[in-house]
Amino acid sequence: MTSRELYTSSYKKIFGDWGRSSSLLYTTNSSSSTRSQSYRPREAYTSNISSYRKVSRSPGHLSSAQDHFDLSQSTALSNELKIVRTNEKEQLQGLNDRFVTYIEKVHHLEQQNKLLESEVTLLRQKHSEPSRLSHIYEQEIRELRSKLEEQEQDKDQAQLDYEHLGACLEQLKLKLEQESARREEAEDVMKNYRKDLDQATLNRLQLEKKVESLLDEIAFLRKVHEEEIAELQASVQEAQISVEMDVVSKPDLTAALKEIRMQYEVLSARNQQSSEEWYQAKIANVSLEASRNNDSVRQAKEEITEYRRQLQARTLEIDALRSANESLERQLQEAEDRSNEEMSHLQDTIGQLDNALRTTKEEMARHLREYQDLLNVKMALDIEIAAYRKLLEGEETRLTSVGGGSMFGIGYPFSSGSYSGGRSSTTSTISIRKEEKKESPEGGKGGSSGQPKTSKPGDQEKISQKAAAN
C-alpha cells in the first residue's frame, strides 16, 4: 500500500464523504478545483459544530458536567470554550486549506518522482551501453595497436633486409668492378698475346721463307758442289790419263794427284758435313721456335678461352644478381607501399575509434551530469516530501494533543454523528499516520532503487522553514 493510498484513506476517515470528492479533485492538478474544494471543509466544519453542539447539549453530558463543575465555572468554561472553538475553527480552516495544498504537492511530487525514476532507469541503461561499447572499442584499439606494432616490426625487418641487400649489392658492385678490371687486364693481355702471336706468325713465316731459301741455297750448293766434284773428277780423270801417258816420264805426278784428290775429298766432305750440320741446326732452331710459338699460342688461346668462360660466368652472375636486386627492390617497394597503406588505414581507424571514444565519453559525461542533476532534484524533492510529512504529522499531533476529544468533534466529521464515532475515526487516523511514519524510510529506500536518500539536517530545517512560511 503506497503513501498516497494511506493519505487518501486517512483523509476519508477524517473528513468523510467530502474528502472523496476532494481527493478526486486533487488529481486534476488545477487551481480552480483546489479553490472550490477549499470551501467544502468549511461547510462540513459548520455541520460538525452543530452536531457537536447537539451532542454537547445531550442530557448525559450535562449531567456529567454538573457533577464536576459548578455553574460559575461552567459559564466561564463555556465562554472560554467558545473562544477556543472560534480560534480552532479559524486554525482548522487554514490547516484544511494548507492540508489540501500539501496533498496536491505530495501527489505532484510523487508523479515527478516516478518520472525521475523512469528517467534514471533509462539513463542507467544508456550508461551501461556506452561502457560496453567503450570496452569493445578499447579491445579493438588494442588489437589494432598490436597489428600496428607487428607492421612496424615487419617494416623494421624489411628495412634491415633492405640494408643487408644494399650491402650485398655494394659487394657485388665491388666484385663487378674488380671482375671488370680483371677482364680489361685479360683483354690487354690477350691483345698482347695476339700481338705476340702475330709476331710469332710473322717470324714463323720469315723463318719458313728463310728455310726455303736455305734449302734452295743448299740445293744450289749441292748442285754446285756436284758440278765441282764432276769437274774435279773429270779433271782427275784427265789428269790420270795424262799421268798414265806420262807415267814413265813423270812418276811423282800420280802421287801428287792422289794427294790433291784426297785433299779435295776431305774438303768436300768437310764442307758437306758443315753445311748439313748448319742446315740441321737451322732446322732445329726453326722447329724449336715454331714449337715454342705454338705452345705460347696454344697457352694464350687456352687463357683466352678460360677468360672468356669466366667473363661469361661473371656476366651471367651479374645479370642474375641485377635481376635479383631489381626483384628485391620491387618487393621492398611493394612492402613499403603496402605497409604505408596499412599504416594510413590503421591511423584512420584509430582516429575514428578515438573520435567515437571521445564522443562516447562526452555523452557519458553528459548523461552522468544529467543523472547527477536528476539525483539532486530527486533528493531535494524527497527532502521536501519528508518535510511536508513532518509538518502534517506535527499538525496532526498538535491537533490531537491540544483539543482532546472536543477538538475531534469540532474539526472532523463523525461517521455516525456521535462523539464516540469521531473519537474512533481520529484514533484510526492517528494509528495510520504512525504506520506511515514507520514505513516512510523503508518506502523511500525501496523507491529510490539505489539512489541517495540522505540529506543534511540543515537542508531539511531550511526546507521545513520555507514550507512553514508558505
From Swiss-Prot:
Spans annotated as Coil 1B: 137-232
Tissue: Nervous system; in axons in the PNS and in small perikarya in the dorsal root ganglion.
Disulfide bonds, paired cysteine numbers: none
Biased composition (Low complexity): 414-431
Region described as Coil 2A: spans on this chain: 252-270
Stored InterPro entries: IF_conserved, IF_rod_dom, Intermed_filament_DNA-bd, Intermediate_filament, Keratin_I
Region of interest called Coil 1A, as start-end residue ranges on this chain: 91-123
Chain spans, region Disordered: 414-470
Keyword Metal-binding recorded: no
GO molecular function: structural constituent of cytoskeleton
Family annotation (Pfam families): Filament, Filament_head
Name listed for the protein in its UniProt record: Low molecular weight neuronal intermediate filament
Organism: Xenopus laevis (African clawed frog)
